[in-house]
Amino acid sequence: MIKRKRSVPEVIPMTLFYMLRVFGSPIIIFIGIIAVWIDSRNTTETMMGIAIIIIGLSPHILAYALARSSRKKIRKILSAIKSSESFLPEPQYEFWEPHSEAYLGIDAKRGNFVYIRLIRRGQVDLIGFDMHNWVGIELDGRLLNIKTKTIEAPVLSMGTRAGDGDRILSLINTMSNRQYRYDCYYFPGYVAHNAKRIAEEYKVFIPVYN
């Protein structure tokens, strides 16, 4: 069974990085601005101030680069799942976690949705749902919890951006009142089948759930 909860050694660097962005970065940038403003005629002092500002901005630049990298990885996985016959959500029904480590795409026309999470390096969750193989969806603040029917992953969580959580719940509730036909294929099985191929192609571990 894959371990989703991050260990203490994994959490500590993330916490320190978050604190640096929230608390350390503004202070460093402020010091740099003061250094430039106090002696703007002194080229050396000005360059030093600019360097300090860049150092202060670097955590945000790194966070942006990591988010872009995560989104790029997820998009590669999605390219193997999306098709006009099985799963093709409209852009407004594709939701990303704030740091792009998780994705939820909802195909309202076909009654399917896909959850992807980059758990850690080399480990990815890729799960397909129709309107029958999940228990419920709840919103706790901005944390969306999908309750599944699998013992290995009873709850799948995803942070949401402002307003997205309510939109997801509203959309799913609307879809629950529709009558979808799944005569041609079993969508969760389709995703699980593709997950094996994706795991081999991208050299990642994707757990398969029954």
Locate each region found by the language model.
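Short, Lys/Arg-rich, polar N-terminal cytosolic tail immediately upstream
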Residues: 1-9
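Short, flexible helical or helix-coil boundary motifs
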Residues: 27, 81-91, 179, 198, ...
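Alpha-helical transmembrane spans
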Residues: 9-73
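Anionic N-terminal interaction surfaces
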Residues: 45-113
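Acidic, Ser/Thr- and proline-rich intrinsically disordered linker/docking segments
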Residues: 2, 135-210
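Generic detection of short hydrophobic beta-strand segments and adjacent strand-loop junctions
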Residues: 95-101, 127-129, 153-160
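Phosphoinositide-binding peripheral membrane targeting modules
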Residues: 109-143, 149-153
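Transmembrane helical hairpin unit
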Residues: 35-45, 97-99, 118, 135
